[in-house]
């Protein structure tokens, strides 16, 4: 049976943060254990030290490190009790080494997907790795020029799944109008449509797109982008049914109703937000513990929990692993569906 399960790499993230704790908690979950063959990329000593510390503090919902397959990340990081919750240059460098190792092994075909625990971007920068985040490293090392961050969460209330793609990500708000172009939005729509078909089996998707300005520009009174190019681009886009540009404040009403199972609102298969907070504020309000970051456009599946390192919580036994569990389950599900889609395409040729 295990031979049929997808093989996933699970990085430890920053070893001084909550990454090791939520990895141990996630791997103790029977549903996670049954969904994939999981190899942790990091230091076994970090897992063992975290396990001992948390057991001393009364935690019981932990996987035993002795039974966890580990691929040593090559950083040589050693976790002492005094380093827990105190991220530094060494822990930042270690988290980068774990990710790099996982990517290299995935490109060699050893893993069908990567699940990444949280890292601290500022510690990467201090360690000499000036990347905006893990997504950009994944794209560069895999040679992926067109990629995107899709946030996915399934409602525990209704079973409905929200999918939100960001057109722009980690840039200052002042740069958003300068970065948004017809070419960029069209490329993001193409990426989203292709991914909905390949990964989620949605052949004819409906996509809702937010406007950039309040009230989607109010016919040019509150901003020109919608009037001068965005509305026309969406009207003529040929590969999916598009709703928009929609007023950003009211676009999220129907998804919220669907999330909580209120009535039968008209919802899209996916939503395109034009900048970071426009998409992630509603996602985190609805699904902070369940949202998963799915990177589109890579040659393998990559997911991550939608939260940070939480150094202030590390080692206390209180970190919640639900988002990481959801990231693992989604990676396993999509690895299987992606493989099935590839086999179907090959059979048609």
UniProtKB/Swiss-Prot annotation:
Enzyme Commission identifier(s): 1.1.1.262
Stretches assigned to coiled coil: none
SUPFAM superfamilies in the cross-refs: Isocitrate/Isopropylmalate dehydrogenase-like
Membrane spanning stretches: none
Gene Ontology BP annotations: pyridoxal phosphate biosynthetic process; pyridoxine biosynthetic process
Cofactor annotation comment: Binds 1 divalent metal cation per subunit.
Catalysed reactions, as listed in the record: 4-(phosphooxy)-L-threonine + NAD(+) = 3-amino-2-oxopropyl phosphate + CO2 + NADH
Localization per Swiss-Prot or TrEMBL: Cytoplasm
GO molecular function: 4-hydroxythreonine-4-phosphate dehydrogenase activity; metal ion binding; NAD binding
Keyword Iron-sulfur: no
Binding site for substrate: 135, 284, 293, 302
GO CC aspect terms: cytoplasm
Subunit structure: Homodimer.
Further comment: The active site is located at the dimer interface.
Official protein name in the record: 4-hydroxythreonine-4-phosphate dehydrogenase
